[in-house]
Amino acid sequence: MKPVLPDYSKAGVLIVGDVMLDRYWYGPTGRISPEAPVPVVKVEQSEERPGGAANVAMNIASLGGHAHIIGLTGQDEPANVLANKLTSLKVHCDFVALPDYPTITKLRVLSRGQQLIRLDFEDKFENTDAQLILSRMESALPKVRAVILSDYAKGALEHVQQFIQKAKAAGVPVFIDPKGSDFERYRGASLLTPNMSEFEAVVGKVKSEQELVEKGFALIEKFDLGALLVTRSEHGMTLLRRGLEPFHLPTQAKEVYDVTGAGDTVISVLAASVAAGKALDEACALANAAAGVVVGKLGTSTVSTIELAEAVHGSKDTDYGVISEDALIEAVKKAQARGEKVVMTNGCFDILHAGHVSYLNHAAELGDRLIVAVNTDESVKRLKGPGRPVNSTDRRMAVLAGLGAVDWVVPFSEDTPQRLIAAILPNLLVKGGDYKPEEIAGGKEVIAAGGEVKVLNFEEGCSTTEIIEAIKGGRG
């Protein structure tokens, strides 16, 4: 299964959970301390990254999604660092700062790629007022399509049942990364994502895949869950849904370097994909691919849409599929830096026909990469009138992304793609029809940047309008 990446700019996700700051100190070690039998590390580099629920938010932002995070912090320097880092990534931070607690901070000391020690600075948040988070959730829920509850057992989800019910009352699915063996706390969740050890802590030792499936379905019934995704390390993932066959996904990790934050990546990509319109099985396939990427990195890491597309398609030289504007700009820069000629075209492509395919094949032959910009449903309706489009934006983009000639598919909501083309600046802009180059939207900007504009002929006898009329007349 090779799913097409959705447009993550449509994904609004609310994250509620245990936020923390991950700090890393790096340096060489070449001697043992005379004070105790421990290595001496000469710290030469340091780094700070959002961790826990904050890493989930960072993952969603790196995909181009809209992340809104609610969590508990102290009134201290780590809280300011955490908020500043997330805000710089366009994450909306809504922290509850409590004066009697420190912001959870984890300091890791590494040498030659190996973690030597971790130091935790934390006190569990206890007896907090649920309304502090519930009131913030109430304001955020109308703006999102998914909720993630990220539980590290640090106290932010002390009132987790109230949070689940608040989201369900708003009609928003709730995805939970659980902690501990008390799954009763998560009753009614749309999806739980335990790893294998967390799963076995609840159901007992699992000796076979069949036993995993049986015990998993029993958990779904017992705790009134919508679905269960068990992450199984080198054995991949298993998705269990009410009334459906088990869905097994093999691991995509080529090399495991560090599993820190892998669970955060799984739930963030899964929830963002569902929020962007993907079915649960496709979202799990994307999350599985993302996990394979992130375990190959050191420390708490994120996955970009470029990396995710490469993981899904198996190579940096294969089609990337549907992509957000920000990710496309990044991808085009990389392609042009490699000396590749990027070609761009645009259209509604409402009912894809032989004329479209011929045109796109011709366009692809003019360069190394082909971008197709697609009018959104609202844009098509303004241009073509009531009753159009026949196919939704997601379906039109999915079909285009499946063509061998097409590398990237990106949506735009305006009447013309002029702004988008000016942001992308392809090497060659092509358009079908009888236009003059200077009349083509975005043409002036491309030429001013040193690019070219070319008009291609459409194949005669192929027209979306004619196809629609033929179907209406019963000639289809």
From Swiss-Prot:
It catalyses: D-glycero-beta-D-manno-heptose 7-phosphate + ATP = D-glycero-beta-D-manno-heptose 1,7-bisphosphate + ADP + H(+); D-glycero-beta-D-manno-heptose 1-phosphate + ATP + H(+) = ADP-D-glycero-beta-D-manno-heptose + diphosphate. InterPro entries: Bifunc_HldE, Carboh/pur_kinase_PfkB_CS, Cyt_trans-like, PfkB_dom, RfaE_dom_I, RfaE_dom_II, Ribokinase-like, Rossmann-like_a/b/a_fold. Residues 344-476 are annotated as: Cytidylyltransferase. Its EC number is 2.7.1.167, 2.7.7.70. Gene3D superfamilies: 3.40.1190.20, HUPs. One of its GO terms (cellular component) is cytosol. It comes from the Bacteria. Pathway: Nucleotide-sugar biosynthesis; ADP-L-glycero-beta-D-manno-heptose biosynthesis; ADP-L-glycero-beta-D-manno-heptose from D-glycero-beta-D-manno-heptose 7-phosphate: step 1/4; Nucleotide-sugar biosynthesis; ADP-L-glycero-beta-D-manno-heptose biosynthesis; ADP-L-glycero-beta-D-manno-heptose from D-glycero-beta-D-manno-heptose 7-phosphate: step 3/4. GO terms for biological process: ADP-L-glycero-beta-D-manno-heptose biosynthetic process. The active site is at residue 264. Keywords: ATP-binding, Carbohydrate metabolism, Kinase, Multifunctional enzyme, Nucleotide-binding, Nucleotidyltransferase, Transferase. Residues 1-318 are annotated as: Ribokinase. ATP binds at residues 195-198. Pfam families: CTP_transf_like, PfkB. It is an enzyme of class 2 (transferase). One of its GO terms (molecular function) is ATP binding. In the N-terminal section; belongs to the carbohydrate kinase PfkB family. Catalyzes the ADP transfer from ATP to D-glycero-beta-D-manno-heptose 1-phosphate, yielding ADP-D-glycero-beta-D-manno-heptose. Homodimer. This is Bifunctional protein HldE. It comes from Vibrio cholerae serotype O1 (strain ATCC 39541 / Classical Ogawa 395 / O395).
